[in-house]
Amino acid sequence: MARVAVVTGGTRGIGEAISLALKNAGYTVAANYAGNDDRAKAFTDATGIKAYKWDVADFDACVAGIKKIESELGPVDIIVNNAGITRDATMKKMNRQAWDEVLDTNLGGCYNMCKAAWDGMLDRKFGRIVNIGSINGQAGQYGQVNYAAAKSGIHGFTKALGQEGAKSGITVNAIAPGYIDA
């Protein structure tokens, strides 16, 4: 039986490419999305990859999403935390809601997804987690203090969680791409 991989934000952009690459490599892929139902249906129709809708910023929704995928496809052994949003504004113009939404989705989503699948990975002594950061988490970007903070946080989160998982066969890595034309 093929290992099950979940890709958040997996129906478009970088996530779509990751979902397809994993499918082509022989994995059973579940693509998470939060918004566009028509786009998700078109993705599933074109790729044969099932799309599951929930907001990664919602912890309970992540737990329910992992449970649903595991009941339909089998144990989740791979998570690619790709879901992300922007709410760009300079600090002078940024409101607290824009800050919270970006941190809750981009960084909180990584925690929520990892926490939802962690115990199963520990029990099976196997897991692969890839967190998608950004070059802007390392270098910063004008008008993106919220996004840069979230993506920088992913780097520290990845390092710490990787240390926790190593003794149990769980690897945790991050990728920090630059600008992408999607």
Pin down the residues of each PLM region.
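Alpha-helical segment proximal to the catalytic Tyr-Lys
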Residues: 119, 163-164
